[in-house]
């Protein structure tokens, strides 16, 4: 099955061979299968909370990616994202979460950081709404920004964030912004139109909430009102490899 724009962008953002990649995207295994092909030295872990879905993913993997050694390159789990057994698997980790709201994603990440306080791991995130809340949480965790960009699929616009959670509490070299920075640095007309539409959607959303008496929304509306869309040579802001 062909990947959509959003999953394709996620695959393209995995530019190094992690020892372990966790597909927590509620995507029927499509992303993880693409990463199995692209990163032959990585172990890909497929995670879903719904038993019937993970059973189907397991059968598909057995069919298309049969084990050739005693150590298969993929594993499947029926569990909550909060319960990922990161420390049971030595090496570098990338956790990919998409297809859920930024509020729920925030809960997942906070719990993962709490349960693995001495372990660095990367996160590749594509939330549905509530990105400001998610960014607040990532900033509180002292997350290191690697890249951020906008991607449009089926007339919906998503933020794609690649960050690293580090165990140290020292100064962060590339901290996140609450409203994004390189999201608004565009290199062509199409990107400019997407950025303008997305910014307008956010401004209108928080303006409506602020008019309803939401003090937090008033602050967010003002923050997005201050955003400027700028022309840039590179709109992905690849900071750290």
Regions inferred by a protein language model and the residue ranges of each:
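Glycine-rich SAM-binding Motif I of class I
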Residues: 29, 33
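Local beta-strand N-terminus motif with an aromatic residue
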Residues: 18, 41, 92-93, 120
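Class I S-adenosyl-L-methionine
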Residues: 2-9, 84-85, 93-94, 103-241
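S-adenosyl-L-methionine
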Residues: 52-89
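Conserved class I S-adenosyl-L-methionine
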Residues: 18-27
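Short glycine-rich anion-binding loops that position phosphate/pyrophosphate groups of nucleotides
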Residues: 27, 100-103
């Amino acid at each position: 099955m062909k990947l959509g724009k959003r999953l394709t962008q996620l695959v393209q953002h995995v530019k190094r061979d992690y020892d372990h990649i966790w597909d927590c995207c509620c995507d029927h295994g499509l992303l993880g299968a693409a990463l199995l092909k692209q990163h032959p030295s990585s172990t890909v872990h497929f995670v879903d909370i719904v038993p019937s879905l993970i059973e189907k993913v397991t059968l598909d993997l057995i069919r298309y990616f049969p084990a050739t050694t005693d150590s298969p390159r993929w594993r499947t789990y029926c569990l909550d994202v909060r319960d990922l057994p990161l420390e049971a698997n030595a090496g570098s980790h990338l956790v990919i979460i998409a297809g859920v709201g930024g509020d729920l994603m925030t809960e997942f990440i906070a719990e993962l950081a709490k349960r693995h306080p001495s372990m660095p791991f990367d996160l590749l995130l594509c939330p549905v709404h509530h990105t400001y809340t998610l960014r607040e949480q990532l900033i509180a965790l002292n997350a290191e920004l690697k890249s951020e960009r906008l991607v449009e699929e089926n007339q919906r616009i998503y933020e794609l964030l690649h960050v690293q959670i580090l165990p140290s509490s020292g100064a962060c070299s590339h901290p996140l912004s609450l409203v994004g920075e390189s999201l608004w640095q565009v290199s062509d007309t199409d990107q400019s139109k997407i950025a303008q539409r997305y910014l307008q959607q956010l401004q209108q959303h928080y303006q409506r909430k602020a008019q309803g008496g939401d003090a937090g929304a008033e602050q967010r509306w003002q923050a997005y009102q201050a955003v400027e869309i700028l022309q840039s040579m590179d709109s992905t802001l690849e900071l750290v490899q």
